[in-house]
Amino acid sequence: MKKTLTLLTSLISLSAFAVDAPYIVATPPADAGRGLIRVSEKEIRHYPGKGGKQMLQSLDNGETWKSVPLHKNYPGATCLGKESPAIAQNPTTGEYIRFEPLYRGNNKNDGVYTTEGGIDGIWSLVKDKDGKFARPGGILRNPIWVNDNKRILIPGHGGGCYTWYSDDQGVTWSRSNVVKSPHHKPGGVHKGTRWNHGMVEATLIELKNKQIWMVARTAQDQHYESFSKDFGKTWSEAKPSRFWGTITMPTFHRMEDGRILFLWSNTTALPEIASATGRGEDAFTNRDTIHAAISEDEGKTWIGFRELILDEHRNNGDYGTRSGSQDRGKHQAEIVQLDKNRVLYSCGQHKIHRRLMIMDVRWLYEKERSSDIAKDGAKDWTTHQFIQKKVGHCAYNRTIGSEVKEGALRLLRLEDETLDNPNQGATWNFPTGDTGKVTAKVRLEKGGSGLQIALCDRWFSASDATVDQFANYVLKIDADGKVNGKQILTPGKTHEIAIIWKGVATKGDASLMVDGKKTNIKVSCNLATPIGVSYVHFYNPATDTDLEGASVLSTHAQVK
């Protein structure tokens, strides 16, 4: 009851003041997903990967950070230089346990470690009664304790997802059954096949009904989910979850007040090209942002769906090779709670892309967002286009795409055979809503080809030509400013368009206002969604060179 009252008080007070957006505090020494650990009330650390001699340390609860030498007792990581081991504190003993991302070979120093005397005490390899080292197989993520802390669960993958479980605090381990997602297949918008790596990188959370919920990365458009009723020993058949996300890592976190926080990339990759066979890693086109949502009812409904950060390098012409050719982007996360309302999280892969950030989760409850291009320069927009030649590790270089000119984003079509698509677009995120209103000031330039405006429940590339097939609502305005033969805009003149949708979960229609006046134009709901609308996507539909295009001057979203 006390937690409920605290939560209600917190939410009521939210309306009394503005909440700061998430902000960067440091760059972690390893890719996000492992190695971030609270040590005391004020101290938090981020450990490095194999070969690392320095760790990142905060002594003021995550606000400031410095690089310091690893403690002499800490056993060096043995797996990958770019990835730290997973380190967790045992809630029963207060000691720490460590797992490498992967155990391979016969390294005598390779195995599960536990501490005696705290994180800077003695680290020892775990051995069973026969003297064998504990080395759970597969690629592993962070452990959780379930069933009143009687069991440790580690999500792993290899040929599908499974869990390793231990009922003796990590001495011996058993493995669950394997759950799999279906292979991606060509068809529809896909001429080729995505990299079919199967169901991998699962995240786990114990629900209040004692079920364990698994959500995992797949090659499909959605993360897949599975449930266990016996604390991770057996798992149900995996099925699509409500969460969009393609070949990106999801992460659950239980807040101290009981709410569930979820970090993932609510993004869809570009359609697969004909040369994609599904047998190897592809060019990743949907890792430029990471999102957060929060649930107060054990995952039945979710609030937020907000971009936490857009990749600072997303428009770079040398995106795929700058500072080396490793994996890159903003997907992957790990979370530490700081206080009642704030969390610290790591996100991203690659030394110039990964970040440590602080978020006040009350920010997820906001119901409005605005962008004035003349003032903000479209810094919170995705506009880039892809140069369709794979470079580095699974990447495309980029061009900036639509640019800000005279206080507006100008969407053109510039012929360039190197691009995935010469048509320019722009996409912008706002808090999700089952019902809401998006208002935009736009101008069809004289001689331009018109404008497509789509409302979506996920991020699409600005230059994705297939958005109209997957958006929840689509408004197509031709070069003359007409919608289905009805004049609504005058080329060369700035207009204010508002799309008002109601009940997207039940496929409710949307209405249209122009310059503050209602029209009789109905915008049908193409696809219902249980997660609400959280994006507006603008696109130049030209079929030939368009040097005039259309302009977007501002946007405002308000949701319920």
Name the predicted role of every residue range.
Residues 377-412, 422:
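Extracellular glycan-recognition surfaces and repeat-rich motifs
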Residues 9-18:
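Hydrophobic h-region of N-terminal signal peptides that target proteins for export
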Residues 521-553:
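Flexible glycan-contacting loops in extracellular carbohydrate-active proteins
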Residues 239, 424-430, 483-489, 541-542:
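Beta-strand-rich interaction surfaces with strong enrichment in secreted/lumenal proteins
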Residues 440, 493-504, 510-512:
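Short tryptophan-centered beta-strand motifs in secreted/extracellular beta-sheet-rich domains
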Residues 19-378, 388, 398-400, 415-417:
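Asp-box/BNR beta-propeller blade signature and adjacent active/binding-site loops
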